[in-house]
Swiss-Prot record:
This is Small ribosomal subunit protein uS5c. GO terms for molecular function: rRNA binding; structural constituent of ribosome. Its main location: plastid. NCBIfam families: rpsE_bact (TIGR01021).
């Protein structure tokens, strides 16, 4: 059992993770004595080679919340199948809560045409040519998770 934990930590250290903070929000919890302030950080981690994850961290200060978000993001990493032109193999829809997202592959040289949280997720996944459209919700967290949902449902076709 000790060996498995050691292997997990070694694997984590070998991969060069890049992390970007999507949003930091001040949230409150109402308790008997008044309001308790804390911070919620939404963080995306990825290696720009097909692995990406979204994490959420909450703490009483911003830096701890971001660190917890990075740890959570590394626990929720998915692998994205990329084509030779660094795009996705086919069109896909992602959904999380009220957030809907349409992801379409695009021609080489087109770039990442996306906004907000989906753009950060797609760039950290290593996708270079893609079109995306957000529908429904404006929530950064839900749109990031809808992007992850869409990317996790991608399939590659073997002829």
């Amino acid at each position: 059992m000790v060996d498995r934990k050691r292997n997990y930590k070694d694997r984590d250290n070998r991969v060069e993770w890049e992390e970007r903070v999507v949003s930091v929000q001040r949230v409150t919890k109402v308790v008997k004595g008044g309001k308790k302030l804390s911070f919620r950080a939404v963080v995306v981690v990825g290696d720009q080679q097909g692995k990406v994850g979204v994490g959420v961290g909450k703490a009483s200060d911003v830096s701890t919340a971001v660190r917890k978000g990075v740890t959570d993001g590394k626990k929720n990493v998915i692998t994205v199948p990329l084509t030779s032109s660094n795009s996705i193999p086919h069109k896909i829809n992602g959904r999380f809560g009220a957030a809907k997202l349409v992801l379409r592959p695009s021609a080489p040289g087109c770039g990442v045409i996306a906004g907000g949280a989906p753009r950060i997720v797609l760039e950290l996944a290593g996708i270079k040519n893609i079109l995306s459209k957000q529908l429904g919700s404006n929530s950064l967290l839900n749109n990031a998770r809808a992007t992850i949902d869409g990317l996790s449902n991608l399939r590659t076709f073997v002829a």
